Each structure stands twice: as structure tokens, then as C-alpha cells.
Amino acid sequence: MATEEAIIRIPPYHYIHVLDQNSNVSRVEVGPKTYIRQDNERVLFAPVRMVTVPPRHYCIVANPVSRDTQSSVLFDITGQVRLRHADQEIRLAQDPFPLYPGEVLEKDITPLQVVLPNTALHLKALLDFEDKNGDKVMAGDEWLFEGPGTYIPQKEVEVVEIIQATVIKQNQALRLRARKECFDREGKGRVTGEEWLVRSVGAYLPAVFEEVLDLVDAVILTEKTALHLRALQNFRDLRGVLHRTGEEWLVTVQDTEAHVPDVYEEVLGVVPITTLGPRHYCVILDPMGPDGKNQLGQKRVVKGEKSFFLQPGERLERGIQDVYVLSEQQGLLLKALQPLEEGESEEKVSHQAGDCWLIRGPLEYVPSAKVEVVEERQAIPLDQNEGIYVQDVKTGKVRAVIGSTYMLTQDEVLWEKELPSGVEELLNLGHDPLADRGQKGTAKPLQPSAPRNKTRVVSYRVPHNAAVQVYDYRAKRARVVFGPELVTLDPEEQFTVLSLSAGRPKRPHARRALCLLLGPDFFTDVITIETADHARLQLQLAYNWHFELKNRNDPAEAAKLFSVPDFVGDACKAIASRVRGAVASVTFDDFHKNSARIIRMAVFGFEMSEDTGPDGTLLPKARDQAVFPQNGLVVSSVDVQSVEPVDQRTRDALQRSVQLAIEITTNSQEAAAKHEAQRLEQEARGRLERQKILDQSEAEKARKELLELEAMSMAVESTGNAKAEAESRAEAARIEGEGSVLQAKLKAQALAIETEAELERVKKVREMELIYARAQLELEVSKAQQLANVEAKKFKEMTEALGPGTIRDLAVAGPEMQVKLLQSLGLKSTLITDGSSPINLFSTAFGLLGLGSDGQPPAQK
């Protein structure tokens, strides 16, 4: 900031810049010195300390002054110092020096950069220059300043970066790349973009044209791991082996314990060792041959105990497999993929491609590469009543093997027997034909059974007193099996399924069954009949039935049982027809009176008995049973469970008659009960009168005792009455006195409590008012104090913003301007006056200038 002082004292090691306003040339004045400013000079700033560069420091000065060979400052013809514009000068430790006009301290005092060991500065030349050795350096050249040392900066050199040495540990390597053609630390020439590894352990400082890509860690190899590598281009490794582009190989612990991948090696992965136990083997696909190439399409079988690494391109067919250890009940079905011979020299067996054979245990077997294991077979254990279906693949014949453990030969397979869906459902239901015969046919089992093994012989347990018919479709004959028995099906046999009627009334095909129950049993049916007088009735009849079979060993007689597929529906229809015909010839009244006899004779028929009637004719007699000769079904009895009219009016009339009969019976029973009740009432009344007399006598005795006790109590009462009255009066007076005293005491306590409460309330009110007034006063004091602080701070900030120099300039601006105006006129005069004519010297200058006392020119008239 320029100063207007005429006398400027410059301390030691300080300087100022003085501007000559006539020539516009600035110069430097260096202290210690007292400088008297001339009128045509202007001091540009107050004294400033010289620039002092301590040891091991430097600064950069822009636009430095030019010096001659004796380091003297050069001046131009105007006296202005000569500057090297757009140039820089780096100044090291020296005596304090001033900055000449035009010089700028571009970089302040800065310590010199110390380059530590294993560190270097990457330098780049900005201009052409010659170094200390006289070598010419071209702009753009790059080199390293390696430590330890102190770097002296140069204006022609730029520090690009600081390079740190990379520490290479054991089992590590540093991957480098050349940024341009150069020689590495070992003196080997490198081309632009070339990459290589530095494997030496220790700190490595890359050269100027070497770029550090990364630090490569070695892969530690063990006896159980190998490194899978692939060549990215043709190169020769450290062991001198030449690798072609795309070639793959393994590095194991036999080659090296720690392998650092080269720049031209791609790590595909770590291959674990394949270990085969004494009971293991494996099949290697595309094995590597002696020439180091994969034999595509070939196989090699390796049996344990052995450990090896899979070479590149090799793979296991199905991993590590167990050796087939066959017991006496096991076998292997083999298939030849290529012609081969097996066995010893004397017992060699030749197999052509596609041949199948079976080997049996006990033995250990490892299949060769020319053999395929089709399947491992196990002997199937069969109980006496179990079996399997076996089919010969050559002849196609199917047979059943039952009751012995069996192993399939090479030409046999298990055959699945298909059954109709209805038969499958009946077999899977698992219902007991006897115990579950009353359940509905649509009922499902609680837990569905597992699906049937179709290769197993189909078996069915025929319950007691039941029969099952099996039909052989190849032989076209049927056989009947009576229970209890276990029936098994041959491959060509099927069950005869019975489709029976069920429900009330009977519905055809409502129930299906595999076995026929021979009875005795019953079934119920509902039929509708019509009498001769056209009364329609609905009957519910139950029939007991059974099958009569004279000789079970006779196939023809046994086949009669299944001659009628729906014996239930057939029998119910026949019996219903007979009943309808018999009832149609009688009236409702006759049928109502003799329904059981009419139905029995209709169902069983009748025969002439030996009894004769009044006219000498033989009387008919009902038979004991009804026989159906088609299948030997015998109906032994009939039960009329209900008879209901179908017509509503008939049903109402019948109901009224029944109600009338019930009312008559009820009235008779009511009269008898009434008579019995009257008799019992008379007996009870007599007992009651007797009891009353006894009670009256007992009451008289009690009254006598009561009167005696009352007399005694009156005597006692008369003596104690006066005493009790006196005591009660005294007690009342005592209680009344105590109550008055207590009441007065309580009133006094209440008055004291009220007085204390009122005093406390007034005290609290006064305290709160005092606190409120004090708080208001404190707020007003705080407000006034804060306003005073604000005004003081405002005045202080205004004075600081203007500065003391500005305030002084404002104060002396008027007088100084007047003095300068008078000086500019160059007047020199003397004024003589007496004491009677006073002169205002303060306004003299304004008068001379033609201005008023306020400094303004007078208005023109």
C-alpha cells in the first residue's frame, strides 16, 4: 500500500520501491536508511523485509533482473532495471536480497527435496539445455534422480513423480513393461510394450521407461496340487523348455516348489491330485500319449492304489468309481464295445462287439476300456408265496418264477404285468371282503397304499368261504380257487371281476369285487307293490342267502358260481317279481292282515301238505327256501322290515287308524292308572291324618315348656331392667362429653390448618411475583447490554473497515487540498493589518480562490 509520509525510515534488511512520477521509473531503496521522499516521488509500499533463503531451501523468482558477469544488475536507458520477462530464476541459500520492481516471488521459501534411498525422482526436460557435465539435454528427455541425495531444482526440469522402490519378497516377482525402447537394469534391450519379470529378492527401483504392472505371487505347489498353465505365445521358460502358443501343461512339485507364472503363461487353475484307493478305479477320456498330445476318442483304465494328475485335455468319464466287489448273490451284465479276449491263456474267451454276458460273484472286477457295464444285478430273494415275471429277450417267452431266490441271466429281463384299472384299484384298496363288505363302494382307504410292483407276481388272498375265478386267455380256460387260499396269476391269467348291484333299491354295477362270498349273508331291497284294490305299498325286505355247492373239486359245478355276473341284482329282480304277482291278487285289508305269510309264500313258493281242509282238499304249505339253479343261490329266509303306503291319502288313513288304536289303548291304560292313583291317595290320606294327631300332641308338650320358660324370663327381666337402664344413661353421658371435647379439638386443628394454608398460599404468590419481576429486570438489563455490545461492535467494525489511514485522510483532506491549491498558484505575498480589523485566516484561502466559507464558489448574480 502506498504511503504519503515524507520521511520513511527503512530498517536493516528491509526495502521499499520508489516511483518517480516524472519519469515513471521505479527503483529500490535498501535499509538501513532514512529516506526523504521528494515531491515527484511516490513510495509504493511500506518497508518490506528482504527475501531470506535459509540453507537447504530455495525459492523461485519470476521475471528476474538481468545481471552482468560481475553479478551486477543491468539497467536500461531510462534507469529501469532490465528484467528477463517470462523467465524464472531459482535462488538457493544466500544473503537476504530485495525484489526489484517487476520481480515476483512465484514460489515461496521451500525446503529442498531430499531423495531417500530406494527412491528416485522422475525428471523431464522442459527446455533444451546443457547439464553440468556439458552434455546437451533435449526438451522431452526423461531420466531418474536416484537417492540418497538432495535434489537441486532447475528451471528447465520438471519433476514428474516420485518413484518408490518395490520390495520383492521370497516367492514373488515384479512384472514390468517397457514404455519405449530401453535397456533394463541388467543391460538387456527391451522394445516398447515388452513385458518381463524381475525375480531377484530385494528392493527394485524401476528405470525411467519401466512401468510396474503388478507384483506377482508365486503359486506354492504341494504333492497334492499342480498348476495348469497355457502359453500365450511362443517362448522358452526358465528350464529351457520351448512352449508353443496355446500349448497347455502342468507344473508339479517335482518341477518346482513355488512357481511364479511368466508373462507369457496364463494360469488356468490348480489341478488337485487324483488318488485311487485299493478298491477304486477310473476311466480317463482322451488320455495323453507318449508324444505329449491327447489321443482323442481313446480311453484308459487306471486301477488303484495310485495317485496322479490329470493332464490338460484329460477328463474322467464318471469320476472315481468303486471296484465292483460281487458277492455270491450278485452279478454284472457286461457288453463288449470292441472285439476282445478275456481269461487266461488256456481259458481265453473271445467276445465280439455288442456281445452281452453275465459274470457272477464272488469276485472283484474292474471293467476294461472295451467293456461297458450295463447293470449290476442282484439275486431276487423269493419266499414260497412270492414270485417274479421273467421274459426271455431272445424268444419273448414270459414265465413266472415262484418260491426260490433267482438271478436273471444275460438274456432275461423283468417283465411288467399290466392289469385292468378296475383290478388295480381293487388290489390297492386293501379292503377285507368279509369285514368291509358293509361299507360303500366309493369309500377310500385312510392311507393309500404304495403303487404295485408290476414285475412281482400278482397274488390275492381269498378269504374263508369265498371263491375267486381266474381266466387264462391263452389256454382259454378258467379255474376257481376257494378260500382260505393265496391265488397267484400266471403271465396270461386275469381275475374275473364281479359287478354287483347295491343300494336300496338295488342299482346295477354299484359294487365291484374280485372274490365271491359263499354266504350265509343277507341283502336288503326296497320294492313297490300294488294290491287288488290299487293300494300302492313300499316294502323293505331282507333276504338271507348262501350258495350250495356239492362238490368243490368239480370244475363244472364250481364254474356255475360265476355263471351269473350279478347274482344280487338277478335274485332281487326275481323275488320282487314274485312278490308283486302275489300281492296283486289280494286286497289291502287282506295283505295288511297276512302280509308276512303272503310274502313268504310268494318268495319261497308252496307245496301241498298232508293236511286237508273241511272239504277234504289238501292245504298248501310254504317251502323253507328258494333255490336259483343257474348258480346254486339259495334264499333261506325273508324279513319284512317295513311296509309303507306310497299314496299319501292311504298313508294318512293308515296313520289315523293307527293313532285311533293308540288312543284306545292309551285311554284304557289311563283309566287303570287313575284307579290305582285314587287307591294310593286314600292310603296316603289315612297316614296323613294319623301323623297330624301325633304332631298336635307333641305341639302341646312344647307349648307347656314354652310357658314355663317365659315365666322364668319375665322374672329375670324385671330385676335386670333398672340396672341396665342406669348403666346405659351413664355411658351415654360419658360418650357425649368425650364427643364434645373431641369436636372442639378437631375444630381448632381445622382452623390452624386453614390459617397455615392461607399463609403458605400468600407466601407462594409473593415469591412468584418477585421471581417474575426479577426475570423481567434481568431480561431488560440483558437486552440493553446486548444492544450496547452491538453498537460497540458496529462502530469497531466500521473503524476497522475504514482503517486509521482512511479516517486520518478524511480528517485532513480539506486543509491539505487548500494548501496544495495555494502551492499550485505559486503566490508569495505579505499581509499587514492592524488589530482593529481582524482577518479570518481560516477562510483566507477560500477567499483567494474565490470560494465561499463552505468551499463552494459563490452564485453568479
UniProtKB/Swiss-Prot annotation:
GO terms for cellular component: cytoplasm; cytoskeleton; nucleus; perinuclear region of cytoplasm; ribonucleoprotein complex. InterPro entries: Band_7/SPFH_dom_sf, MVP, MVP_rep_dom, MVP_rep_sf, MVP_shoulder, Vault_2, Vault_2_sf, Vault_3. Its main location: cytoplasm. GO terms for biological process: cell population proliferation; ERBB signaling pathway; negative regulation of epidermal growth factor receptor signaling pathway; protein activation cascade. The modification Phosphoserine is found at S421. There is a cross-link at K444, K704 (Glycyl lysine isopeptide (Lys-Gly) (interchain with G-Cter in SUMO2)). This is Major vault protein. The gene is Mvp.
